[in-house]
């Protein structure tokens, strides 16, 4: 049983267990009340950066908040697809769930890195620590995925040619 699980699958499942509920709640708070959700603790650095450096109107700020929520929900969707793929043994053994995990890690890393840069620009140390921690978790799982060996295909059993008799029909391709 333990031979079926890859270390990147376990690491990805643990990362998904954190990001799916956390980023879903943050995104739904933004969807319900865009401005109020944007100025909550996980997004305060993005909100302050947008208001200080961009000088956007109210509706443009709402659109930026929705764009952030859409990005986070996209990461959540890829993590959910990854977890669904993990339930199937064929995908898990062959490493087929790696594409969904790679997409979630790459998009999530970009969002966390941008949020971390914005937090450093506006001087939010708590938000900086949060986004740096999220980025390190995502990059750690990405490094595990990159350094892990590819999945080895199961050996195929070949039948001996002596089983063929003269009474068995032969295909036209076997001439």
Regions from the language model: what does each represent?
Residues 32-60:
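Membrane-interface interhelical connector segments
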Residues 5-36:
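N-terminal signal-anchor transmembrane alpha helix
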Residues 19-29, 75-82, 108-115, 141:
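Helical transmembrane-bundle signal
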Residues 11-19, 68, 101-111:
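Hydrophobic alpha-helical transmembrane segments of polytopic
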Residues 2-3, 78-106:
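Cytoplasmic juxtamembrane regions at transmembrane-helix boundaries
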Residues 107-175:
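Alpha-helical transmembrane segments of multi-pass integral membrane proteins
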Residues 58-75:
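Individual transmembrane alpha-helix segments
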Residues 28-39, 82-95, 118-121:
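Juxtamembrane transmembrane-helix termini
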